[in-house]
UniProtKB/Swiss-Prot annotation:
<dbReference type="GO" id="GO:0016757">
    <property type="term" value="F:glycosyltransferase activity"/>
</dbReference>
<dbReference type="InterPro" id="IPR001296">
    <property type="entry name" value="Glyco_trans_1"/>
</dbReference>
<keyword id="KW-0328">Glycosyltransferase</keyword>
<comment type="similarity">
    <text>Belongs to the glycosyltransferase group 1 family. Glycosyltransferase 4 subfamily.</text>
</comment>
<keyword id="KW-0808">Transferase</keyword>
<dbReference type="Pfam" id="PF00534">
    <property type="entry name" value="Glycos_transf_1"/>
</dbReference>
<protein>
    <recommendedName>
        <fullName>Putative glycosyltransferase ORF330</fullName>
        <ecNumber>2.4.-.-</ecNumber>
    </recommendedName>
</protein>
Length: 330
């Protein structure tokens, strides 16, 4: 079986690799129990044409659809996207490929493109649990992570302003770190944005380092205007780092923590919020007593570790795939 992904060292690479690692363990368990009909070989590649393709839905539609209709007519698209780019699709263009996306929000945008859509969230990485449960010290008030674009859809500009205005201990992992310097004490490349505010370039850290930073933060500030899922929010919940999140798009479905009022007006794929609301919610969160914080942190952590457990998520995924493709892949 071939697992394809759109890029290396990106979020799609992360979720594809985690699925493959779980699948290899699942295969061994099945073989040990006497089931020798499970797939023997699992390969990963970049690009189109996999049996399961971890990819941005818009990218698949524009670049892989034509290829897959000929070379991989039964491939399963495992993807998400925060944007509804594609419009004016005629009935004869609707794809027969199965789309397994990560939120009802995403599914609602792409029903015009796919005849059959299932919703299965991402799972958390078991490695994260082994890392974050060893972290005891909170060094930062808030952390935010994201690859931002010119329209600031991740809300990093707002996050920085909030941190500056409220004098928060702030760490950001993003593609918006300019004039990068080197922190001699850790040898990690980072930039000092302001007093107690640092930025670390996106994808320069190991997964363990990212998980450790999340666990060292009290809150995760999730100000995205649009998300098809939002993996760092899941990672923060698993660590017990409480999300302060925009109450819209995919976050409205699965994020647990402290919501920020949001609204969608002219665009179905974009949620706005007021800066004053963000400041008020963040200030309130910062004033939470230690006992209240500990209770909320524990509840968020326990619920997320149950609902997004790899066995729960991936078994659902493979059951859907086996049910809807022409032959069992697993």
């Amino acid at each position: 079986m071939i697992i394809s992904k759109q890029c290396s060292n990106c979020s799609f690479d992360v979720v594809a690799t985690q699925f493959v690692q779980w699948l290899q363990s699942y295969r061994q368990q099945q073989q040990q129990s006497g089931n020798h009909h499970v797939v023997d070989i699992i390969l990963q590649k970049i690009g189109c044409g996999g049996d399961i393709e971890f990819i941005d839905i818009n990218l698949w539609w524009s670049q892989c659809r034509t290829i897959d209709e000929g070379d991989a007519p039964h491939s399963v698209v495992r993807g998400d996207s925060p944007y509804a780019y594609i419009t004016n699709v005629s009935d004869n263009e609707i794809s027969d490929h199965l789309l397994v996306t990560t939120s009802q929000y995403n599914a609602s945008m792409f029903r015009k493109l796919f005849r059959h859509i299932e919703v299965v969230p991402h799972a958390y990485d078991p490695l994260e649990v082994s890392v974050v449960d060893k972290v005891k010290e909170k060094k930062f008030d808030v952390i935010t992570i994201g690859y931002d674009t010119a329209d600031d859809h991740k809300g990093l500009t707002v996050a920085r302003k909030v941190a500056l205005d409220l004098s928060l201990r702030y760490v950001e992992v993003s593609n918006q770190c300019d004039n990068v310097g080197v922190n001699a004490s850790t040898s990690q490349t980072q930039i000092q944005l302001a007093d107690n505010m640092i930025c670390i370039p996106f994808m320069t850290l190991t997964r363990e380092d990212v998980y450790r930073l999340i666990a060292q933060s009290r809150f995760y500030l999730a100000l995205s205007h649009t998300e098809g899922f939002g993996l760092p929010v899941l990672e923060s919940m698993v660590a017990g780092t409480v999300p302060i999140y925009v109450d819209g798009h995919a976050f409205h479905e699965y994020a647990k923590g402290i919501p920020i009022p949001a609204y969608s007006d002219k665009r179905v794929d974009w949620y706005n919020y007021e800066y004053e609301d963000v400041v008020e919610v963040v200030k309130s969160a910062m004033s939470t007593s230690q006992s209240e914080y500990n209770e909320l942190s524990m509840r968020v952590k326990e619920e997320s570790r149950h609902y997004f457990h790899p066995d729960v998520v991936y078994r659902k995924l493979i059951n859907i795939v086996n049910k809807n493709v022409k032959s069992n892949l697993f």
